[in-house]
């Protein structure tokens, strides 16, 4: 059967509209979890204020030089802040991926679904999803640090891995390998969607500072919710595409 991107886009749009409130609640809940975890594990305001003490920002040619000019205590605070942000985002992304995919599965099975039920049903697979998303993020970030393009290619090739892990109950590395093979064979259908997702996330990041006009906490939740909705649309598209490819 010939698969066209247009038909998958249409199916994605219809599903997103029909389940919008449930997906919105999952996105909002994941955003709230991300912000709360980030706040809990981040250094205190007094510690963060120490990062500016005695660091010659104007004389630093880059981030590496800036870190080198910090004291050991400041470097530890920066590491803690970075780790807290990364950990909270990974947790939020894992819950989002599990929740959205379970929404699709439950709706496809003709069952009633709510945000809490979807997240609860995804609980058994969250540890594997967390590790998968961590490894995927790590590979993409390494690729972006090298020449940018390898990171984008990795993001495309590994896009189907979460769907395969949940839908087919694959292992972490098996889903990554299968995603690479299947995506490579269907690059014309996967690449435009992933590139659009990356572009949308980048644009949101550029305007994220404007959300802080409310309060930092509310702005962070709002920005994360919009980011989660963008990711949810991509997950719906990839799930629908994967099911069509398997037929």
Swiss-Prot record:
Residues 1-19, 111-117, 173-186, 246-247 are cytoplasmic. InterPro entries: UPF0259 (IPR009627). Coiled coil: none annotated. The chain crosses the membrane at residues 20-40, 90-110, 118-140, 152-172, 187-209, 225-245. Keywords: Cell inner membrane, Cell membrane, Membrane, Transmembrane, Transmembrane helix. One of its GO terms (cellular component) is plasma membrane. The keyword Magnesium does not apply. Residues 41-89, 141-151, 210-224 are periplasmic. It is a multi-pass membrane protein. Its main location: membrane. The keyword Membrane applies. Signal peptide: none annotated. It comes from the Bacteria. It is found in: Cell inner membrane. Belongs to the UPF0259 family. NCBIfam families: PRK02868.1. This is UPF0259 membrane protein YciC. It comes from Shigella flexneri.
């Amino acid at each position: 059967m010939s698969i066209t991107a247009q038909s998958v886009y249409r199916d994605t749009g219809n599903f997103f509209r029909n389940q919008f409130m449930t997906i919105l609640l999952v996105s909002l809940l994941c955003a709230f979890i991300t912000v709360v975890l980030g706040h809990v594990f981040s250094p205190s305001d007094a510690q963060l204020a120490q990062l500016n003490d005695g660091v010659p920002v104007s004389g630093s040619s880059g981030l590496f030089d800036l870190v080198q000019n910090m004291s050991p205590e400041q470097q530890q605070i920066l590491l803690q802040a970075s780790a807290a942000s990364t950990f909270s985002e990974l947790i939020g992304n894992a819950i989002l991926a599990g929740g959205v995919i379970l929404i699709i599965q439950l709706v496809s099975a003709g069952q009633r679904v709510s945000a809490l039920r979807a997240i609860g049903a995804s609980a058994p697979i969250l540890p594997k999803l967390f590790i998968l998303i961590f490894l995927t993020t790590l590979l993409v970030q390494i690729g972006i640090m090298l020449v940018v393009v390898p990171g984008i290619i990795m993001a495309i090739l590994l896009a189907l891995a979460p769907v395969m892990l949940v839908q087919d109950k694959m292992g972490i590395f098996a889903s990554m390998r299968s995603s690479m093979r299947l995506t490579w064979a269907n690059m014309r259908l996967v690449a435009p969607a992933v590139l659009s997702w990356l572009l949308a996330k980048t644009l949101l990041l550029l305007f994220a500072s404007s959300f802080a006009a409310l309060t930092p906490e509310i702005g962070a939740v709002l920005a994360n919710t919009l980011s989660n909705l963008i990711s949810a649309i991509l997950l719906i598209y990839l799930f629908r595409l994967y099911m069509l490819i398997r037929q």
